[in-house]
Each structure stands twice: as C-alpha cells, then as structure tokens.
C-alpha cells in the first residue's frame, strides 16, 4: 500500500509538472522563436532556460518581477530591481514590466556578454553545444547545469522550435498551429 501511494503521488506530481511545462511552452514558445529570429539564440535553449530558471513561470522571481532567466543586476544594470535569496541572501536581480522584456533582456545579456561570444559561432540547431557552452561560460553555478536544459529540450522536443525559428513566415504559421491545440 505504501509503495502504491508513493507511485501515485509521484505520478500526480509528474503530471502536474508536465502540465506546467506544457503550458509554459505553449505560452512562451512564440517569444523564444521571435528571439531566435532576432538574435540567433536557439529557441530551444531560450525555452529550456526559461523553464529551468523560472520553474515554468511559478518561481517567486518570475511571478513577482517577471524575471524568467534568473539574471542578476550586475554593475551596468539601470532598470528595475528586486531582492531575492539565491546563492547568497538578499541578492539583486533584474525586474521587468512583463515576460517579453525578460526574454528580450536575456537575449541582449547573452549577445553583449563577451564570455558568451563563442556560442554565436555554433550552429543555431546545436542546442547541446549551447547548453554546454552556457555552463562553461558561467551562466549558472549548478555543476550539472549543462545536462538540465538538454534533458528538457529532448523530453519536450523543444529542438523542433529551432527549425521553426528560421523565418518569420514559419513563425506566424507555427503560432496559428499552436493556437489550435
């Protein structure tokens, strides 16, 4: 009976997580595709990072400050801020008016950061190279960070959005397809 209860609870938690992830993907995939078109960052990477860093939109940072990527203030940030406990207590994080601003700033953050420049030499469909490169460049402190986005990308087939991000026409038809689901 205990084993059955454990399996049932685990299954319900996995389904809830899957539902949250699927809802996040449905809601934010168009933004990730748009960012890919504008900045040449794989949509799969942007979505996987958003899912990870925001807890599929349920983290305190995402809910209270629209920060979907866990980006800290840094020395040159002049926008809104929020305090949050992370690696240390009461750290400064960027705050945004809406999720779209967070997605745009994430792209700008990667494009402007010299430590990420080598990533833009990778193929746009090389999500594994991007994930490993983000870890190598110091995007996150988690030692297993590179594997986490790769697993999400493969489990949720986010790599499909990378090819859809190639043209604006494809993105529009894809958005119509998403709305039908």
Model-derived regions, located:
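Hydrophobic h-region of N-terminal signal peptides that target proteins for export
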Residues: 3-13
